[in-house]
Amino acid sequence: MLAQTFKKPHRAVLEQVSGTTVFIRNKRTKSKSSLSPLAQRVVTQLSVMSASRKQPKLLKLAREDLIKHQTIEKCWSIYQQQQRERRNLQLELQYKSIERSMNLLQELSPRLFEAANASEKGKRFPMEMKVPTDFPPNTLWHYNFRK
């Protein structure tokens, strides 16, 4: 019985072997109504172009649920804004501290200051060129970077 099943490789077959039902699924085939490669390419291009215009569906909420939703959204945006302000304040304080220490170094030892700010010959990728970020950049590389 199983030998007959394998003669039809492109179909799912339901067989009864010794009182039990066996479901055998084989290789899928393309449907006969598939588009030509040219038509498929056009469909793909149109779907890619329209992907940027697709908007999520508007929520249809009751009035109370809408008020709750808007309140939560507003609180979330305020929280995000506070986080950004905290982060910016911390970065500003770090920058001012670095600036003060560099000015102090310049006053105390101009020779050390020059050595600290000297460009290193043969260094292909300066650390100042890229900073660590949470997300990948829009432009992958700055080809015209000069120090």
UniProtKB/Swiss-Prot annotation:
Present with 6300 molecules/cell in log phase SD medium. InterPro entries: Ribosomal_mL40 (IPR019192), Ribosomal_mL40_fung (IPR042831). The gene is MRPL28. This is Large ribosomal subunit protein mL40. Gene3D superfamilies: 6.10.250.3440. GO terms for biological process: mitochondrial translation. Component of the mitochondrial large ribosomal subunit (mt-LSU). Mature yeast 74S mitochondrial ribosomes consist of a small (37S) and a large (54S) subunit. The 37S small subunit contains a 15S ribosomal RNA (15S mt-rRNA) and 34 different proteins. The 54S large subunit contains a 21S rRNA (21S mt-rRNA) and 46 different proteins. It is found in: Mitochondrion. The keyword Thylakoid does not apply. Belongs to the mitochondrion-specific ribosomal protein mL40 family. GO terms for molecular function: structural constituent of ribosome. It comes from Saccharomyces cerevisiae (strain ATCC 204508 / S288c) (Baker's yeast). Residues 1-26 form a transit peptide. The keyword Protein transport does not apply. It holds the Pfam family MRP-L28. GO terms for cellular component: mitochondrial inner membrane; mitochondrial large ribosomal subunit; mitochondrion. Component of the mitochondrial ribosome (mitoribosome), a dedicated translation machinery responsible for the synthesis of mitochondrial genome-encoded proteins, including at least some of the essential transmembrane subunits of the mitochondrial respiratory chain. The mitoribosomes are attached to the mitochondrial inner membrane and translation products are cotranslationally integrated into the membrane. Keywords: Mitochondrion, Ribonucleoprotein, Ribosomal protein, Transit peptide.
